[in-house]
């Protein structure tokens, strides 16, 4: 993700607390490289975790990252649908609506 595509709040934190964000980004990279999962699978897992804690910003972020890693929209939606029996329909539906926004389908 290029600097200009970061959400405003993230850019503000990065500009004002660069060491903190740098450490956070290094941690993210380290944990993704710590095992055998590929980038797409890792992003889909993180997307599911974000949905489970109802973090709209993290759902947006991991949906974008999953797409960049090669996930198809159907895989992203399926990742969320799989959560229904764990986090409930309303939470799943909310997460799907956040992904819908990211995919550009929520425009208009």
Residue ranges of model-derived segments:
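Alpha-helix boundary/capping and short turn/kink residues
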Residues: 18, 57, 72, 89-92
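Aromatic- and histidine-enriched alpha-helix N-cap/loop-to-helix transition segments
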Residues: 39-40, 74, 87
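Mid-chain, well-packed structural core segment of small domains
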Residues: 52-81
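C-terminal structural segments of small proteins and small subunits
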Residues: 77-102
């Amino acid at each position: 993700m290029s600097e200009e595509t970061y959400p405003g709040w993230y850019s503000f934190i990065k500009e004002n607390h660069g060491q903190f964000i740098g450490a956070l980004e290094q941690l993210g990279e380290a944990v993704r490289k710590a095992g055998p999962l590929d980038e797409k699978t890792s992003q889909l897992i993180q997307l599911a975790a974000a949905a489970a804690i109802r973090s709209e910003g993290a759902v947006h972020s991991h949906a974008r990252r999953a797409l960049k890693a090669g996930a198809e929209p159907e895989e992203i939606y399926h990742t969320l649908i799989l959560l229904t029996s764990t986090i409930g329909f309303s939470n799943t539906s909310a997460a799907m609506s956040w992904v819908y926004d990211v995919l550009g389908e929520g425009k208009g």
